[in-house]
Amino acid sequence: MNDTFSLLQKYTGISKYSKSEVITPQWVVSDMVDLLPQEIFNPDATFFDPAVKSGRFLIEIYNRLMASGLMKQAFPNEQDRHKHIIEKQLFGFATSPTAATVVRKTLYDNPLSTGNIRFTSDKLTKELIQGAFNNMKFDVVIGNPPYNKGMDIDFINLGFELSTKYCVMITPAKWQTAEDNQRIASKMTYGQFRKKIVPHMSNVVFYPDCKDVFDIYQCDGICYYLIDSNNIYDKCKVTNISYNRSYINRVETRSILNRESLWNIGNEIVEYLGDTSKIEMQTGENCRYHVMTNSQLSGYDWFIPEGPRYCLAVSVIVDTKNGESWSGLKTLSFGSDDIKECESFISYINTRFVRFLVAITLSGEIGLPTSNTFRFVPAPPSGKFDHIYTDDELYKDFNLPQKYIDVIEAVVKERK
């Protein structure tokens, strides 16, 4: 079964019904449904989308049910199987009358039939849903809740409370890093959400750059996840993906409360480097040459929505004896009478490796470079600035695993 909304997109150019709506791409819908265990696609399971827009979640589930061996065993006749699925297994609450009509036309032989796709108000509440479906609960709740006004965690909680087995949602990833007592317009604080919902998460897929999924801006990235209503997990499988490349090249299972993010991966790299001696800034106040930079430093919030960033502004060498202007520049506290040493220093701090370690000290800040900015940056293995450094050289010298190299090169822009 193909969704009618895709045909509307193809022939009319409509991408969504209103400016506030975010339509989930089909490939993401498929990936989200993949999180569910195969045994859930059986004749007794019920599936509910609490925020139906395109209908893609319900249509994807319909296709999985039609192809399920358990369903074919119970309903060998294809028409009987179809009838059972649309009458007994698929339920949805639409975000608008238009969305309801489009999805009904896709699912039902009679597009005017209400079926199990309801719309009574655009103000979605637990009471409204229970009233529309006679206090029914569902084995699986899946969808893309509204993001406006920071109410997404309330919708996740709603899905959790309406599900008897699993809840699969795609939402902004702010819940990973927000302060415990923070709330925007939601009833829950992020701390309450993490305490109640996060222990039930068994699988999280995180996109730090929202534009890898949606054509919208979300400064905290986007994630989708499987919530197991009946089980609590000490650890959770977490996958970070950017530009269609996985940060984790093997299955990683860890505590979700670690707030899996580039900050955590940065900490892993720092721990991996261990007690290597750190770079020391030569103030060189009386030296002829000074390495200078402007004040624009950008931390790791960066990478969203614009993708890789430089993280450290361009540095220049100022010849103090020639009276060159320092206007608009701030010192990096490095000086030398040997211009070649300054050039070597600049090549070192311009590597992606060093700029990544600078970025994780900033944690989203923008400000002036200080000696603290470089606190995670190791000194060159030789201890000298005597040649032009490259990333390949440093990766080899510090024996950096490929999984960390992939992270660095995905989020820090090459400087040419």
Where are these regions (language model features)?
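SAM-dependent methyltransferase catalytic region
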Residues: 1-213, 219-234, 238
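Short acidic/histidine-centered micro-motifs embedded in hydrophobic/aromatic stretches
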Residues: 411
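C-terminal substrate-recognition regions of SAM-dependent nucleic acid methyltransferases
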Residues: 15, 19, 27, 202-203, ...
